[in-house]
Design a protein with these regions (language model features):
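Flexible propeptides and autoinhibitory/regulatory segments associated with cysteine proteases
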Residues: 1-43
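Peptidoglycan-targeting cell-wall enzymes and recognition modules
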Residues: 2-20, 48-161
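Non-transmembrane alpha-helical segments in soluble domains
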Residues: 26, 44, 159-160, 181, ...
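Short, mixed-charge amphipathic alpha-helical segments
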Residues: 27-35, 144-150, 172
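Surface-exposed patches in mature extracellular/periplasmic domains of secreted proteins
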Residues: 33-43, 56-60, 169-181
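Acidic helix/loop microenvironments that form the catalytic cleft of cell-wall polysaccharide enzymes
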Residues: 47-50, 173-190
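Extended serine/threonine-enriched, polar tracts that run as long, contiguous segments within proteins
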Residues: 160-169
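Low-complexity, Gly/Ser/Thr/Pro-rich intrinsically disordered linker/tail segments
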Residues: 170, 183-207
Length: 207
């Protein structure tokens, strides 16, 4: 199936970049076998939730101390530590370097990898290992991938790559939004909104 510009406009009514997104998706979706109404609906729904309607292409870590304690208590076990990070002038960088240190292929907190490889793209690609794998698939460097992820094409292609790499079409074919969400999010955060996007997308795509 072909996702038309009018359909995308209905799916993302507040997005001013429909032409850009449509140009990217019309090429990429068929390339990654996201080519049936259920697959396209599931893909667009998940991306719309993850990116605030295809508007946010970089992870926002602008958290207050209370949120750091609530969301990342493992890394901020005390109020004092959370406050220390929340009040830093470069707090998003500092927070990323702490919460993503020594995992997903990243170095320790001092390496700066956490922020360098923080979430980017429509389905936020996170961690040095994922950046390297995505870059390798395109035969570019992780640094080039980081820049590419800031473009419409790169943000969309990284999401398609993640979708294919994690075999998400099998869950899209079943309409299993719960499992899809767990594969993307690690949990079920925002499930209600994702389902709402999905049902709307199915309607728009005439399925």
């Amino acid at each position: 199936m072909e996702l038309t510009k009018q359909q995308l406009k209905e799916l993302l009514p507040k997005n001013p970049y429909i032409d850009n997104w449509h140009s990217a998706l019309s090429i990429l979706l068929p390339d990654y076998d996201i080519n049936t109404p259920k697959r396209v609906a599931a893909f667009v729904a998940q991306c719309a939730h993850e990116s605030g309607g295809f508007m946010v292409l970089k992870e926002n870590l602008n958290y207050k101390a209370a949120s750091l304690r609530k969301l990342f208590g493992k890394y901020f076990p005390t109020d004092e530590l959370a406050q220390q990070y929340a009040s830093k002038p470069n707090k998003q960088e500092a927070i990323a370097n702490r919460i993503y240190a020594s995992r997903m292929g990243n170095g320790d907190e001092a390496s700066g990898d956490g922020y360098k490889y923080c979430g980017r793209g429509l389905i936020q690609l996170t961690g040095k290992s994922n950046y390297i794998a995505f870059a390798d698939s395109l035969e570019i460097t992780p640094e080039e991938a980081s820049e590419y992820l800031a473009t419409f094409e790169g943000a969309a292609q990284s999401a398609c790559w993640f979708w294919e790499t994690n075999n998400l079409n099998q869950w899209a074919d079943k309409g299993d939004i719960v499992t899809l969400t767990k594969r993307i999010n690690g949990g079920t955060i925002g499930l209600e909104d994702r389902i709402k996007h999905y049902e709307h997308a199915l309607h728009v795509l005439g399925h």
